[in-house]
């Protein structure tokens, strides 16, 4: 057995022409990004071809995913809209990424699943897919989504927890790569930050309008209570952060 981890830097900024680009233009970020994505697809195809050539295709789980949203200098079309990239931000354009799982003969073709999945779920999923004893995996944060891969219902997540403090020792904080420490919990619709701000991500994907606490429906109140319980179940500070060295200026105009 083997595990191969291949993090491509190809579609990362800056955005020069791809190796196979025609009409090369160093300044055309949008065209070059599209070329990069197409070239990345070709490289994935080479990996799959190599598995087939070595007789490993039918016994290999292939998982393809992104690690964050697109760079903000790019606008992509999605469902008829032009959306600015959200890399570095905590709203959906920065955290909601593609995930494809493929295993001929094991994962039925053509499935689309909208369950919540976090990166912490990958380890228990791979363990279950390999038929290995789970040991203490179920005591960790990850939930296996292998049953869903096989077309079964499984045990879908009811929430996802997020913690973001990328550069705790910055001299000045902002709402992006030097983001101030933030924690949140979310379900398929609502997202609650540790400062009490709740957002309806289906109606307000860019999180511009806080849900009014006083005018909330019973369903919204239940969601808030559930997500607050999730936040309360995790430490409220980063275990690896030396807070005596956190001296950056916190901009007062930030929402959170």
Task: Please annotate each region the language model reported.
Residues 1-4, 56-62, 96-97, 155-157, ...:
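Loop/turn elements at helix/coil->beta-strand transitions in domains of secreted/extracellular proteins
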Residues 2-7, 37-40, 44, 51, ...:
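Beta-strand elements within well-structured catalytic alpha/beta cores of enzymes
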Residues 70-90, 107-111, 115, 120-203, ...:
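C-terminal cap/loop subdomain of S1 sulfatases and analogous C-terminal strand-loop tails that border
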């Amino acid at each position: 057995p083997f595990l191969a981890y291949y993090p491509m830097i190809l579609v990362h900024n800056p955005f020069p022409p791809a190796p196979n680009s025609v009409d090369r233009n160093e300044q055309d970020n949008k065209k070059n990004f599209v070329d990069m994505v197409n070239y990345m697809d070709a490289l994935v195809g080479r990996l799959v071809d190599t598995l087939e050539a070595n007789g490993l295709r039918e016994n290999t789980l292939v998982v393809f995913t992104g690690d964050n949203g697109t760079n903000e200098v790019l606008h992509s079309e999605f469902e008829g809209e032009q959306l600015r990239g959200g890399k570095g931000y905590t709203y959906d354009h920065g955290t909601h990424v593609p995930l494809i799982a493929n295993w001929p003969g094991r994962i039925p073709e053509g499935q689309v699943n909208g369950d919540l999945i976090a990166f912490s779920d990958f380890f228990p999923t791979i363990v279950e897919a390999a038929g290995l004893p789970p040991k203490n995996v179920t005591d960790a944060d990850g939930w296996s989504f292998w049953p869903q891969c096989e077309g079964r219902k499984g045990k879908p997540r009811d929430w996802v927890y997020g913690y973001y403090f990328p550069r705790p020792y910055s001299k000045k904080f902002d709402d992006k790569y030097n983001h101030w420490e933030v924690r949140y919990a979310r379900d398929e619709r609502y997202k609650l930050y540790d400062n009490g701000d709740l957002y309806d991500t289906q109606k307000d994907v860019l999180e511009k309008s806080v849900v009014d606490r006083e005018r909330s429906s019973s369903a919204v109140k239940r969601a808030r209570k559930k997500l607050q319980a999730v936040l309360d179940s995790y430490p409220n500070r980063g275990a690896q952060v030396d807070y005596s060295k956190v001296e950056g200026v916190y901009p007062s105009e930030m929402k959170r």
